[in-house]
Amino acid sequence: MNSTPFIAVEGPIGVGKTSLSHRLATYLQFHLLREIVEENPFLKDFYQNIDEWSFQTEMFFLCNRYKQLEDVEARFLTKQKPVVADYHVLKNIVFAKRTLHMKHYNKYERVYKVLTEDLPMPNIIVYLNASLETLLKRTDKQQLTDSSVAL
């Protein structure tokens, strides 16, 4: 296990992962690793037709997170520079299991295992939770903010 502090913050959408990660990184003077969602070119199509676009969407996220974690390991962890992330790569397999048909999931799982077998894993995982009512309010606010920014 890596002795350099590597903290991952996880939880459902809208729970405050990014906010807490940012605060922790600032307070502890750690590098902040933020999840990149907006760059996924398949996400819009995914929300319109999950069955058609789930495999491409999940593969993009997996490859993107693989590259991020590979870079973080090389640039920070191997140089004893601590990191806090607002996601854990394990979420990929959880989402894939929920969105992919079995045929695609089996392929995805094989790729996931190959890519993640030697990735750095956090030595601390913080899991946040909130009531469904709170999560719905927060995601509604995020959608309003995101749509106003897009204009």
Please give the residue ranges for each predicted region.
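Post-Walker A alpha-helix
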Residues: 20-21, 25
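Conserved substrate/cofactor phosphate-moiety recognition/catalytic segment
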Residues: 26-64
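A glycine- and Lys/Arg-enriched "phosphate-lid" helix/loop adjacent to the NTP-binding pocket
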Residues: 92-151
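Pre-Walker A (Motif I) flank of P-loop NTPase domains
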Residues: 2-6
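Conserved lysine of the Walker
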Residues: 17
